[in-house]
Amino acid sequence: MFTTGLPEGVRSVEAGKFTGLGRGARQIVAPRVLVDATSVPADRGALGRYVDGLVAALDAAGADLAVACQRADEERYGKLVPDARIVAGPTAIAHRPARLAWEQTGLPLVAQQVDADVLHSPHYSMPLRAGVPVVVTVHDLTFFTEPDAHNPVAATFFKSAIRTAARRATRMLVPSKATRDELVRVLDADSTRIDVAYHGVDHELFHRPAQEQVRAVSDRLGLHGQLYLAYLGTLEPRKNVPALITGWAAAVCDLPDPPALVLGGGSGWSEEVDEAVAAVPAHLRLVRPGYLRFRDLPGFLGGAQVVAFPSRGEGFGLPVLEAMACGAPVLTTHRTSLPEVGGDAVAYTEPDSESITEALAQLLADRGHREALGAAGHARAEEFSWAASADAHMACYQRAVGQRGE
C-alpha cells in the first residue's frame, strides 16, 4: 500500500495491472474500468451482493479493474479482487450527504488518477462531470411506478438521479428486460443506450444446505426444529411484507402445527409492517431476526417449507434466485422482472393478502409440489452466474468507450 496523488483523505492500493502510465502512453485493448462501490451499505444487502459478485467475476476474468470503496471496505475488496486497484475514499463518505458530494468532486479525480477509460456507477446516481464515459446501473423504476412504497425523501432523490442518468449517462445497465421497458415507457429513454445484464448468484454460498446447517440456523433463530416460512429482504411496503404477514396468518391459523414466519432483513421506513405484526394471532409465531449472516442464508432459505417473496415490483429479484439456488420452493408474484427470474420454476400469486393466503395454503398442503418446485428452481438457478453477468457488463463498458465524444 502506498499514498498517491489522490484527493485528500483518499488512499490507494496498487495492483500489477496498473502501470502508472498516462492515457497517451498505452493502447486500450480492453477498457480500464473504475467501479464506484462507495454506495454499498455496511449490511451489504442486495446492492452489496450485486457489486461484490460483479467485481469478483470481473477480476477473475482478467478485467483491468479499479474499485473505489468506503474506507471500512478497503480490506474486504483487497481480498475479494486481488488483481484490482483499490481506492478508499475519505472517512466522511460513510455518511450519505458527504458521499454524494464526493461523488461529484472526488470520484472524477479518482477516475483521472487511475487512468480509467470508463466509470461504472452501480446505484442510480453519477458524477455530472466525470471526464470519462459513465455507465449507470438503474435497478428499477418503482420510485416512479410505486411512489407510495418508498420514503418520500428517497423517492424524490432517486427519481431525480434516474432522470439524470437517462439524460447524461453514456450508457445504462439494467438487471432485467422489465426494467429496460419501464425506463423507455416512463422516461422515454433511448433503448439503444440500455443494456440488460442479469444478476448472478454465488453458487459457493447459495447451495442446497446440509441438514446440520438447517438445524444450526433453526436453533439460532430460536425455532429448534419448528417448521417455518421464510422471507428475505428489507421489511418495507414495496416488498409487500404486510400482505405477506396477513396472508400467512390466515393460511396457517387453523393448522394443528402452524409453521412460523421468519422475516429476515432490516426494517424499512414504514410502520405498516409493525401494524401487521401486531394483528397476528397470539398462538402464531413470527420471528424478526434482522439481518442474517451470509453464511446462515443457505440454511435459512433451504430449510424453509416455502420462501415467500410477494413483491409489488422488482428490478430483478435476487432473493428469489438465491432461494432457488438453495433448493427452496419459492412463491412470488408476476410483477415486473420476477417472471424473468423464476420462469416456470416457482409458484406465483397476486400481491393481495387473500391471494397469498390461497397460494400458501395450497403449497403447504402439497409436499410433492413443494419438492418439485425446489428441484426445478435449483436447476433454473444454475442458468445464472456472475461470470455471465460480468461478460454482459464488459460488453456495455466497451460500447461506452466506443461512444466517447458522441
Question: Model regions: which residues?
Answer:
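Carbohydrate transferase catalytic cores enriched for Leloir-type hexosyltransferases
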Residues: 1-406
